Amino acid sequence: MSSIGIGLYGTGIAADNHAYAIAKSSKFSLVSVADEKYNLAQSFSKRHHIDRCHGDLEYLLEDSSVDIVLLASPFPFNSKHFPFIAETGRSVIIETPLAPSLKEAENSRVPKYGWVKHCPCSALRSNIW
């Protein structure tokens, strides 16, 4: 059975923690990383031995090896990035709040895409990774 490909958007401190957790998994592999600051994506990909890095979310979403997108951008931007990811039909993992307010979350078009579950990352790591 091949592993499920994770594409990571955002390269901050939380992203490092996710990368270390994913590296320990036999079920998942970190196949692609992107950050709007391309130099950060490059250094992150070298540090975590990821073959593909991008300077834009759009390029990450064009990567056919990405099955799930782990959105690790600062939370005020999650509601902006989420619809673009969801429109590809991929599952999205977001550890932080979707938006700074309920109104922004509702306006992010989440209801259009279906199921949403609050799943703290620590529970995700212990149950899946």
Predicted regions and their residues:
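N-terminal Rossmann-like dinucleotide-binding module
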Residues: 1-48
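Structural signature of beta-strand start/N-cap positions in the alpha/beta core
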Residues: 5, 29-30, 65-68, 91, ...
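Structural motif
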Residues: 9, 72, 95, 121-123
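Short alpha-helical
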Residues: 13, 39-40, 76-77, 100, ...
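Short helix-capping segments at alpha-helix termini
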Residues: 26-27, 88, 113-116
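Beta-loop-alpha module in the N-terminal Rossmann-like domain of NAD(P)-dependent dehydrogenases
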Residues: 48-110
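A contiguous active-site-proximal alpha/beta segment in oxidoreductase catalytic domains
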Residues: 99-129
